Amino acid sequence: MFVVIFRAKVRALDDEYAHVAARMRELALMQFGCIEFHAVSEGDSEVALSYWRDQESIRAWRAHGEHLLAQELGRARWYESYVVQVASIVRDYSWP
């Protein structure tokens, strides 16, 4: 399993951002094999974690047309900067 970590410094968010973010989450979960998605924001920082079975699914998601457009909008309007990290999950356990 893999996790994609998206960390951003927010410039300004608007109503379109909320719509686009909800659509991207829906697409990732329903059509591209994203297993789980969590996002939090505090002040001008945003962090999103998405979990995936394989890197092929991540690459397909990254190259999808709607997602590419959302990335362009993010760079142009919503984010000052961002970092994307892809990591392999070595161990996963929970309680209870």
Regions found by a protein language model. Name each.
Residues 1-47, 55-63, 79-96:
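Short S/T/G/P-rich N-terminal loop/turn motif that feeds into the first structured element of a domain
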Residues 27, 70-73:
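Residues that form generic nucleotide/phosphate-binding pockets
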Residues 51:
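Sensory beta-strand/linker motifs that couple input domains to effectors
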Residues 72-74, 78-80:
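Short arginine-rich
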